[in-house]
Amino acid sequence: MTNLRKTHPLMKIINHAFIDLPAPSNISAWWNFGSLLGICLIIQMLTGLFLAMHYTSDTLTAFSSVAHICRDVNYGWLIRNMHANGASMFFMCLFIHVGRGIYYGSYMYKETWNIGVILLLTVMATAFVGYVLPWGQMSFWGATVITNLLSAIPYIGTTLVEWIWGGFSVDKATLTRFFAFHFILPFIVTALVIVHLLFLHETGSNNPTGLNPDSDKIPFHPYYTIKDTLGFIMMILALLLLTMFSPDMLGDPDNFSPANPLNTPPHIKPEWYFLFAYAILRSIPNKLGGVLALLASILILLIIPLLHTSKQRSLMFRPISQTLFWLLTSDLLILTWIGGQPVEQPFIIIGQIASITYFLIIIAFMPMAGLFENYMLKPKW
């Protein structure tokens, strides 16, 4: 009798995706982050569902409903803090996942890569609307500042902002629709994840060498299921440690105060995972220019496959490009730091230099290094 998992219409799909999937024998721990992102998404959807049972999306009661969840609901404090810090874990895994894709040339699978970029944008949108829901000071002013950026769009900008707000300021209508968006977007993310996996399984996984691994494949189960399980345990442990011991470490103290439209916080800033983009936005003194740079900082990922000049796919054997990659990583850390600082010298000039460097490394230096490394491969005798 043939095994049920190989014949049953539903089990067959799961089997081909997670059990009998041929995987390269040499993929490292950097390949764990895709499955970790899956776990993050599941954790966020489950904790979010339980939070939605007790949350009210009304300006008068939103803040107190979050306080009620933390004080009166059984394990509400745990669910709320896991959801808030789970978002940080999600973005940590996302950034590593994208970084691994750039380092090992996974962007050469263009469909998988492009859907991944769309996924990144969708998750960022989900996190942004979710940040507004507790209706604290930074929630309110963050929503006001970021949505207001759309007013930089010529001609239709102001109308567009008022349409999104549902009025002439961020108010009850805005909060209600943001809750609706925050509820629906994770399901859209889940659908995109399935498409992302569909395209990935068309080509098979890349591997650290960037060479064709077809000659040496192993089944996903048990080798990578056990490897992924170790990743799950480590990530969930890290999340629980953060949640139990310092749940407010990554949050903003201003969010302990209810939203007050009459009182602006001295420094408006988003959560840590948006600070790099926020720093790029602020480094350009023109409003429309800043918005375009903000968009470009993420959308530039879409043109990375077009900028690949090297004869080798991976950076594993390319020391010059490796150096540039780690310079880019350092540059993003500098931008993250600058995004959290007030708009004054020397932070302004540091932010401007870091922003220019970010775009230069991706658009100019990496392709040039690829061409130079090609030249170095040629025998010189």
From Swiss-Prot:
The chain crosses the membrane at residues 33-53, 77-98, 113-133, 178-198, 226-246, 288-308, 320-340, 347-367. Heme b b562 binds at H83, H182. Heme b b566 binds at H97, H196. It comes from the Eukaryota. GO terms for cellular component: mitochondrial inner membrane; respiratory chain complex III. Pfam families: Cytochrom_B_C, Cytochrome_B. Binds 2 heme b groups non-covalently. Keywords: Electron transport, Heme, Iron, Membrane, Metal-binding, Mitochondrion, Mitochondrion inner membrane, Respiratory chain, Transmembrane, Transmembrane helix, Transport, Ubiquinone. PROSITE patterns: CYTB_CTER, CYTB_NTER. Belongs to the cytochrome b family. Component of the ubiquinol-cytochrome c reductase complex (complex III or cytochrome b-c1 complex) that is part of the mitochondrial respiratory chain. The b-c1 complex mediates electron transfer from ubiquinol to cytochrome c. Contributes to the generation of a proton gradient across the mitochondrial membrane that is then used for ATP synthesis. Heme 1 (or BL or b562) is low-potential and absorbs at about 562 nm, and heme 2 (or BH or b566) is high-potential and absorbs at about 566 nm. This is Cytochrome b. The gene is MT-CYB.
